[in-house]
UniProtKB/Swiss-Prot annotation:
Its main location: membrane. This is Copper transporter 2. It comes from Oryza sativa subsp. japonica (Rice). It is a multi-pass membrane protein. It comes from the Eukaryota. The gene is COPT2. The lineage of its organism: Eukaryota, Viridiplantae, Streptophyta, Embryophyta, Tracheophyta.
């Protein structure tokens, strides 16, 4: 069927050129990486150091959230509904931080990995092993029930 175009069809528009992005699937050691957000920290050394400190702080925060003295204090509040709402909000923050840490680990950057492990170790030492506060945090009753090692 002839549309009167003399057989001359317009060429298709050129495809947009996209910069190829590479995601590491093995650990690598370098500051040129992306952690959590596109182009962050990028190729800037100062931003990479900030990313390392941020991941360290997130890991310490996650260990603080596991601090059972805080949980026990929240459980002893007089208003059970308000305490339940507060405990739920704190739990939501804990889960969100844990997912952010997991996503950062998926960058496979060795420095990020070491910062997260060091943050967990520092947080454990400070809050769970008893360096801060009045000794090791006592376990809650539900922890004892769910512990597979406990008799």
């Amino acid at each position: 069927m002839d549309m009167g175009g003399n057989g001359m069809a317009m060429p298709p528009p050129p495809a947009p050129v996209k910069k190829a992005r590479y995601m590491h699937m093995t650990f690598f050691w370098g500051k040129n990486t992306e952690v959590l957000f596109t182009l962050w920290p990028g190729a800037r050394g100062g931003m990479y150091a900030l990313a390392i400190l941020f991941m360290f702080a997130l890991a310490v925060l996650l260990e603080f959230r596991g601090y059972r003295v805080l949980e026990a204090r929240l459980a002893r509040r007089r208003a059970p509904r308000a305490a339940a709402a507060l405990r739920t909000a704190v739990h939501a923050v804990r889960v969100g931080v844990a997912y952010l840490i997991m996503l950062a680990l998926m960058s496979f950057n060795g420095g990020v990995f070491l910062a997260i492990v060091a943050g967990h170790a520092a947080g454990f030492l400070a809050f769970r092993a008893g360096l801060c506060g009045g000794g090791p945090a006592p376990p809650l009753e539900e922890d004892r029930k769910n512990d597979p090692v406990c008799c």
